[in-house]
């Protein structure tokens, strides 16, 4: 097992990767496992602006950030450097508030039947009936007909036959969207929301 870290950073003078057990320092068992220096990737004796390191072992489900040292661009002509710690801008998964990237094997996150899923193609884009919604707002109301366990969560989208106040008359959630003739749902937001502190659950 091994994990390869790569960063394209032509202005950097040094790049390191920091490995953590958790997505934030506030979680139980949080610890920094180590810091590893990335090397310049050369091609035909020329630097490609790419940095890389190959760490042996199983790093899956740990978290990481990059420490990137670069010339201080706030002062023109300055040769002083500054180091920034940042998550990976190409992260596939992140910890709390997106501050640390997660080392993840996407094959492990795919639900059963994922490879058999077939995208529904429309004859033309003008055939789409698009509906934008917020994941929590979609089903959070106690009268939505969605089970208490799934209200306001992704799993609410899997419930069929939901009706207002569970009275069996007015369809809600997915069934309501189907009645409207909606073909495409855009989820807003489903990633990191800067104004929301994800460490607070209420």
Residue locations for each model-derived region?
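The feature marks proteins involved in alpha-glucan
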Residues: 1, 45-152, 156
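Short, acidic/polar
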Residues: 160-176
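Short amphipathic alpha-helices and their capping/turn segments at secondary-structure boundaries
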Residues: 116-123, 171-181
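An acidic- and aromatic-residue-enriched active-site/binding cleft used to recognize and process polar
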Residues: 20-22, 69-71, 190-192
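Conserved, mostly hydrophobic/aromatic
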Residues: 7, 66, 133, 177, ...
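Beta-sheet entry/capping signal
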Residues: 4-6, 128-130, 183-186
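Aromatic-lined carbohydrate-binding/catalytic grooves of carbohydrate-active enzymes
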Residues: 140-159, 180-202
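Glycan-association/targeting regions that enable binding to alpha-glucans and other polysaccharides
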Residues: 1-61, 73
């Amino acid at each position: 097992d091994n994990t390869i870290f790569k960063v394209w950073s032509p202005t950097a003078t040094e790049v390191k990767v920091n490995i953590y057990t958790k997505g934030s320092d506030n979680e139980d068992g949080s610890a920094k496992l180590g810091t590893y220096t990335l090397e310049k990737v050369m091609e035909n004796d020329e630097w490609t602006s790419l940095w890389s390191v190959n760490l042996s072992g199983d790093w899956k489900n740990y978290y990481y950030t990059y420490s990137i040292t670069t010339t201080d661009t706030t002062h023109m002509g300055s040769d002083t450097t500054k180091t920034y710690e940042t998550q990976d801008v190409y992260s596939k998964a992140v910890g709390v508030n997106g501050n640390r990237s997660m080392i993840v094997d996407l094959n492990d996150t795919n639900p059963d039947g994922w490879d058999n899923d077939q995208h529904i193609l429309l004859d033309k884009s003008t055939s789409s009936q698009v509906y934008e919604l917020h994941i929590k707002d979609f089903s959070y109301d106690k009268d939505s007909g969605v089970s208490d366990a799934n209200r306001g969560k992704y799993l609410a989208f899997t419930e069929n036959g939901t009706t207002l106040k569970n009275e069996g008359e007015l369809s809600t959630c997915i069934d309501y969207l189907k009645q409207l003739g909606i073909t495409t749902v855009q989820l807003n937001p489903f990633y990191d929301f800067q104004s929301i502190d994800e460490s607070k659950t209420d």
